[in-house]
Amino acid sequence: DSYSSIDSPTRHILKDLNGKSILVLKETNKSQFEAYDWTYPQIIKFSSTDGQVMLDGIVTYPPNYKKGNRYPVIVHGYGMPGTQIVYNRWGSTWNQYLAHQGYIVFSMDARGMSGRGESFKNLSYGDMAKYLSKDTAAGVRHLIDRGDADPDRIGAWGWSGGGYFTGLMLTKNADLFDVGVSVAPVMDFRLYDTIYTERSMGLPQDNKAGYDSTSVLSYVDRFKGKLLVMHGT
């Protein structure tokens, strides 16, 4: 058995068929992390803008965080249908690195993502951008309203689906996001592989409006920030 939480590193335990613990195979003393000012993430809940649902987010604060001070925020996103990014498990060392540079690191599960049942997951069918943009904006505004986030220093980053997420934030949500790093993105899902796309979007000829709404290219006229796009060869 293997398990962890946001405040406990992973433990690997050998159990018998009845579930009785026999031996701890591997564990990490969290004091080794605390020696480097490890900051434990917090899982938060906030309302969607339309008030229809409570959403889950996870926040990693800088080690020297002081309530009442506003900090730059890096939003790490993915957002593809059926995926999940907010977990009660041991956290990312990359997020820790960013937090130690003075950033608040924020991630959330928008409507259409996983972990909340089939009906929640299916809300993004046919338009992957609709709730991803709205719900992420609600999360960022929640951090602004509670006095944590500097509204003039909000950035996004992600890889693959997260690269798409970043492009969407810098365009459709350009009123909130200033900078972004988009790695290996899909900017228009008409140009991506059909076996992945069509199970969430339907056929392009049957859902032109949904593909248009999902495409980052539909919102490039709103772009006013700085975006670094990275990809392989």
Regions found by a protein language model. Give the residues of each.
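Serine-hydrolase catalytic core recognition
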Residues: D1-T233
